[in-house]
Curated annotation (Swiss-Prot):
It is an enzyme of class 3 (hydrolase). The keyword Hydrolase applies. GTP binds at residues 19-26, 81-85, 136-139. Residues 174-176 are annotated as: G5. Keywords: Cytoplasm, Elongation factor, GTP-binding, Hydrolase, Magnesium, Metal-binding, Nucleotide-binding, Protein biosynthesis. This is Elongation factor Tu. The gene is tuf. It catalyses: GTP + H2O = GDP + phosphate + H(+). The keyword Chloroplast does not apply. It comes from Trichormus variabilis (strain ATCC 29413 / PCC 7937) (Anabaena variabilis). Its EC number is 3.6.5.3. InterPro entries: EF-Tu_GTP-bd (IPR041709), EF-Tu_GTPase (IPR050055), EFTu-like_2 (IPR004161), EFTU_2 (IPR033720), G_TR_CS (IPR031157), P-loop_NTPase (IPR027417), Small_GTP-bd (IPR005225), T_Tr_GTP-bd_dom (IPR000795).
Length: 409
């Protein structure tokens, strides 16, 4: 069987904890797993197990990320928590841990801090659709009025970054108190402790406020071309991994990028040397194309549902520039810098025409380790869309990672 199906009874949602350092993200993550473990819907993870996050590589960049999973009555969740601020920045920009929504953790004792603002901005720019707020360390706040003020300030901040500040659920509680109760009595159920109930209240908010993600298979068809070859008597085959949607024999698809966009008809689909009627998201497939010569198509183009994606040469992006220690550049670069932009399956040369700091202030040069907004012009048009990830490379090594925030031309 080439296509065993993974059946899941509940919708799957990817989320993560974001927020300022020491505001209690990891403690809250541990508290969620321990609370839901009492219902048999999670494996309890202690703080240390989450804090010692393993290293992973995404787009040539090393990131520390902890993954936990748990279920509520309605959904199955994969949850990411990062130990360090730089890990969050890299994680969100590379899309290593795709988030369908996030829990913004804010310590009531501090209120919103610089990284709170930075994570909200990042979430907006990389396309995290919805946030739920956990106002942590409520046990350390005597003054109810002060709590109200912090909440008000948060709602204003969220609105400033175009989230729905008025409607976002803000749940007050204490991750530490809940974790403490669950550690002493791992069987504590809902209704037996006010701090544990706050965790349930938070999960109810996440369940109801963060929407079910659209599955890749329901999106318009797209496959980035990795390789091309001719089959005598049958025509030209493009191979690659189907990124989203599905494709059937007889479908008309568009060939987009590098050269003028053109239509062609799919006359065959193969996977594991067997022919299929239909290929779908996640499949590594070979697609036979009518009336296309081997010279008409090359790596870096995409096959897509007609009209679903267009070629562009200019875009704005959010970029993280690697430090020397991470394998990046030793020296700064200036406007006019010409690296390669690795998009899906190919390197395209482009120029970084202009850049600003993340908050939009003018900067003279970019240092390794900086996070910046860039305007890029590519030498060839490529199928690009908002939210798409790319790597920046120089002589074959990755020196930065980015996400497209806006198409210019």
């Amino acid at each position: 069987m080439a296509r065993a199906k993974f059946e899941r009874t509940k919708p799957h949602v990817n989320i993560g904890t974001i927020g300022h350092v020491d505001h209690g993200k990891t403690t809250l993550t541990a508290a969620i797993t321990m609370t839901l473990a009492a219902l048999g819907q999670a494996v309890a993870k202690g703080y240390d197990q989450i804090d010692n996050a393993p290293e992973e590589k995404a787009r040539g960049i090393t990131i520390n990320t902890a993954h936990v999973e748990y279920e509520t009555a309605n959904r199955h969740y994969a949850h990411v928590d990062c130990p360090g601020h730089a890990d969050y920045v890299k994680n969100m920009i590379t899309g290593a841990a795709q988030m369908d929504g996030a829990i913004l953790v804010v310590a009531a004792t501090d209120g919103p801090m610089p990284q709170t603002r930075e994570h909200i901005l990042l979430a907006k720019q990389v396309g995290v659709p919805k946030l739920v707020v956990f106002l942590n360390k409520e046990d350390m706040m005597e003054d109810a009025e002060l709590l109200e003020l912090v909440e008000l300030e948060l709602r204003e901040l969220l609105t400033e970054y175009e989230f729905d500040g008025d409607d976002i659920p803000i749940v007050r509680g204490s991750g530490l108190q809940a974790l403490d109760v669950m550690t002493k009595n791992p069987k504590t159920q809902r209704g037996e402790n006010p701090w544990v109930d706050k965790i349930y209240e938070l999960m109810d908010a996440v369940d109801s406020y963060i929407p079910d993600p659209e599955r890749d298979i329901d999106k318009p068809f797209l496959m980035a071309v990795e390789d091309v070859f001719s089959i005598t008597g049958r025509g030209t085959v493009a191979t690659g991994r189907i990124e989203r949607g599905k494709v059937k024999v007889g479908d008309v698809v568009e060939l987009v990028g590098i050269r003028d966009t053109r239509n062609t008809t799919v006359t065959g689909i193969e996977m594991f040397k067997k022919s299929l009627d239909e290929g779908m998201a996640g499949d590594n497939a070979g697609v036979l194309l009518r009336g296309i010569q081997k010279t008409d198509i090359e790596r870096g183009m995409v096959l897509a549902k007609p009209g679903s994606i267009t070629p562009h040469t200019q875009f704005e992006g959010e970029v993280y520039v690697l430090t020397e220690k991470e394998g990046g550049r030793k020296t700064p670069f200036f406007a006019g810098y010409r690296p390669q932009f690795y998009v899906r399956t190919t390197d395209v040369t482009g120029t970084i025409k202009a850049f600003t700091s993340d908050e939009g202030e003018a900067v003279e040069m970019v240092m390794p380790g900086d996070r910046i907004k860039v305007t890029v012009e590519l030498i060839n048009p490529i199928a690009i869309e908002q939210g798409m990830r790319f790597a920046i490379r120089e002589g074959g090594r990755t020196i930065g990672a980015g996400v497209v925030s806006k198409i210019v031309k």
